[in-house]
Amino acid sequence: MDIFSEKRILTVSQLTSLIRGVLEENFEHVWVEGEVSNLATPASGHLYFTLKDGAAQIRCVMFRASSRALKFRPRDGMGLIVRGRVTVYDQRGEYQLLVEYLEPRGIGALQLAFIQLKEQLAREGLFADEHKKPIPPLPQKIGVVTSATGAAIHDILTVLNRRFANVEILIRPVKVQGEGAAEEIAAAIDDFNRYGVIDVMIVGRGGGSLEDLWAFNEEMVARAIHRSRIPVISAVGHEVDFTIADFVADLRAPTPSAAAELVVKSKEELAARLEFLRHRLVQGGRQVLAERRGELDSLNRSLRDPSMLVGHLSQRVDDLSARLERGTANSVRRHRGSLDLLTTNLRLTNPAVRLERARERVIALAGRNETLLRRFLDHLREKTLVAAARLDTLSPLATMARGYSIVLKLPERCLVTDSARLAPGDRVELCLRRGRAGCCVESSSDT
């Protein structure tokens, strides 16, 4: 009798299949918590890792269809809570957990995804101040990326029309939450940059939960803002809400209404600024005029009396003329003495030829002396005229020729340069370009 005739003999595959059926039937949906180790993320998009605690471990796999929905990236050492079903991997004869959903232990998945992306972009320098573009002080065209039906666009338009109705507004309607919202927002930012028709851009929406605002935490939106050549103002949610877009944007506004107030100044503010600048310009002009007036007064005080200068020059000309006359007379006397000596010698020797030569020499010397004297006098006269012309240019007389006058207080005839030295009833004399005039002071002012 065959001892194996009543026994059921299974193949390895059959046994494995039976075990898999038992496990999958009894552990169809289980929640398990543990620590991640041996995490692998191949190009296929699947996740392979081990979930362990202090006493045991189980292999886990999460296929690409499920892993692509994750908002955060699991890491070795991270505590996870996973949901899945227990199955058997036939090729190794090992049981494993087929994970359908997972979340970080102790913190929400979205919050962890926010922290991870923020740290990554900060390391890449997307939040650095050197990338922040200045907001134009008075934009002509403003682009708005938001929902066409939300409260945000209404608030933005209301504030802009109230503060500066002349500004042109271009609205790019997009989804601001749900599937596809991040793609639409990033595309709208790129479109505005592609066409380049605006000066500044507002990107935002009204308040909501973390899930509602999540499109503004997506990496594609952050990178679209960072590569924008047009300055971007983020205006997402309420004042307490912060998104990744806020950190990347060139300026963060706490609400859409605040963004509209930041992007344009009101007409009243601009008018007040212009009045302030006008006042500064007038004050500066008055100060410059006062400084130039002081410099002119200083120059007038430093100049000597032109008539005295001309008198000194005339006296020097007379002195030089007298010296020339004396020099000429002495020269003539010397030559006359020489002539007399020659005449005496000629009378003694009676040489006709020598006498004629001596006469010619005397005539030549006299002519040369006269020429030199004339040249010297002409040169001196020319220098005198040039000096007189230069003095006339610097003289207050030239200024008086343009309508100015010199004021002398009577009876002491002292020069007046400050109205504070005059009082009503004082007698003054005006020195004009031609002539003088007596006047009586009726009033005086320092302006």
UniProtKB/Swiss-Prot annotation:
Molecular-function GO terms, alphabetical: exodeoxyribonuclease VII activity; nucleic acid binding
Catalytic activity, reaction form: Exonucleolytic cleavage in either 5'- to 3'- or 3'- to 5'-direction to yield nucleoside 5'-phosphates
Pfam families given in the database record: Exonuc_VII_L, tRNA_anti_2
EC number of the protein: 3.1.11.6
Keyword list, A-Z: Cytoplasm, Exonuclease, Hydrolase, Nuclease
One Gene Ontology CC term in the entry: cytoplasm
Main location: cytoplasm
HAMAP family the record matches: Exonuc_7_L
Subunit structure and binding partners: Heterooligomer composed of large and small subunits.
Name listed for the protein in its UniProt record: Exodeoxyribonuclease 7 large subunit
Gene expressing this chain: xseA
